[in-house]
Amino acid sequence: MASRYRVEYALKQHRKDDFIEWIKGLLSVPFVLQAGTPSQKLVTREKEQETLERYAVILRDVEKLIEAHIQIVSEGGSYSQLKMLVPSITIFWTPLPLVKAMYALEPKLCLAKRSFVAPSFNDVRAILGGAQLNYLADNGLDMVSFDGDVTLYEDGQPLLPDNPVISRLIQLLSRGIYVIILTAAGYPSRTGQEYTDRFSGLLQAIEDSDLKDGQKRKLHVLGGESNYLFAYDPLHGLQWVDADSWMLPVMKTWPHDEILEILDTAEETLRSCIQGLNIDAKIVRKERSVGFVPSLGQKLRREQLEEAVLETQATLQIRNFSVPFTAFNGGNDIWCDIGDKKLGVLCLQHFFNISHPSRCLHVGDQFLSAGNNDYKARAAATTVWVSSPHETIEFLDYYFSFLKK
């Protein structure tokens, strides 16, 4: 049976990451040259080191290409050698110590002991994430934003008290780092009750913790991509933050008529998709978002979801709206939000007076370019791409382990 990642990442052009695929291709050469026979699973230490060093040679070259790209972009240039090799490359906020990350992750990845499975998409993704966390551990981190579903908790579930990620979030707060749940879920109520219910396990744990009040106040929730901000108060829980104090000036000038036109156009497109693709779902319209959710007990097919989100994106892009929007696949529903996570991260940096994107991290599970709402955060902060809440915990533990060295 084909794995989920083979279906998602290998067969669908719009679901590929060119940079990861390029590195994977580079690493396939030493794999072929160094692959052993089936009887060599327990290879010698000398053989392992030789194999890893071949991978390291390539990753060192990639490190140098990234550093050169950063330098050229900082000087106002646009075309580096890396850009020519991977045309879709945009910006790196920091160098990436890929070799160090590979060696640190080798006990988990077992790259040197594999004879039949070459370094994969997931292996490269893990090395990139590990390298980013390694750099941040050495150079400082002021803010971490997390997607919600499939990053902190399973899709559609609340953040319950027994979720092991909670202790890691509290550890970040204890170090004076801003922790933000940056979620697409948009609830415009000023009471914040929906977010309080959704994140009750975390909020209760913070209340019961020995964190200082100043550390507790560093927890925030930004909902609807970049629309509703709530700050944690030690006495009153999540409290509404007025938009005038944290939204970027340009966001305050967005024409209300254009926002309505975007939502109307998206709603019309989604209704057409429901009818044309025989989707058993209903439209949900909110103040700054519109989407469809399946009827009770229904599970929508991936192809239906992808077709709907891509058609919605294309329809809106043709109209050339000035107001940013995000159309994305939520796993079993489709949504179109006003704003995006790039703006969300930029708003937070402005609100917290953080000097540079290199001191901010966004962790999420949706970084492919089409129909995925974490992708745009790359333009505002460093990022780590996870595939599950368990991986989020692993990466955070990896970060903490490097802080101790």
Curated annotation (Swiss-Prot):
IMP binds at D147, D149, D155, T183, D333, K341. GO terms for biological process: inosine salvage; nicotinamide riboside biosynthetic process; nicotinic acid riboside biosynthetic process; nucleotide metabolic process. Its cofactor is Mg(2+). ATP binds at K108. Keywords: ATP-binding, Hydrolase, Magnesium, Metal-binding, Nucleotide metabolism, Nucleotide-binding. Mg(2+) binds at D147, D149, D365. It comes from the Eukaryota. The keyword Phosphoprotein does not apply. GO terms for cellular component: cytosol; nucleus. Its EC number is 3.1.3.99. The active site is at D147, D149. It catalyses: IMP + H2O = inosine + phosphate. GO terms for molecular function: ATP binding; IMP 5'-nucleotidase activity; magnesium ion binding. Allosterically activated by ATP. ATP binding is a prerequisite to magnesium and substrate binding. ATP binds to 2 of the subunits in the homotetramer inducing a closure of these 2 subunits and the release of the C-terminal loop, thereby activating the enzyme. Homotetramer. Belongs to the ISN1 family. IMP-specific 5'-nucleotidase involved in IMP (inositol monophosphate) degradation. This is IMP-specific 5'-nucleotidase 1. It comes from Schizosaccharomyces pombe (strain 972 / ATCC 24843). The lineage of its organism: Eukaryota, Fungi, Dikarya, Ascomycota, Taphrinomycotina.
